[in-house]
Amino acid sequence: MIRIMLVDDQRFARLGFQLMLDDASDIVVTAQSADGRSAIETLEQLAVQHRPLPNVILMDVRMPGMDGIEATRRITRRWPTISILILTTYDEDDYAFGGLDAGASGFLLK
């Protein structure tokens, strides 16, 4: 079973990804956050509670507060086994490559 965490400040974007992933029998969305800081806090809570961490995080780059690039940098340092895929739009190539430099495994176009 692949455990996914969705991190995006747009609630409807998270809902859209959730609906797409619900159809996959071997994927489960285990957590959602609206920004990088709350994503890290959620991961810390899961770790303290000895609950399984996500295998993959789908991370938006442009969010208020802590953006996806900084969150990716911090998460990959602390939890290097979690794969992060940066979510970006066509006009955000610099953000996608910044995410890769921060430790993301790849990126997806929204």
Where are each of the predicted segments found?
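Acidic, metal-coordinating helix/loop segments flanking the phosphotransfer/catalytic sites
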Residues: 34-56
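Short amphipathic alpha-helix used as the core "switch/output" element in two-component signaling
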Residues: 41, 69-81
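A short, hydrophobic beta-strand element within the central beta-sheet of small alpha/beta folds
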Residues: 55, 81-91, 108
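Active-site residues of response regulator receiver
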Residues: 8, 60, 88
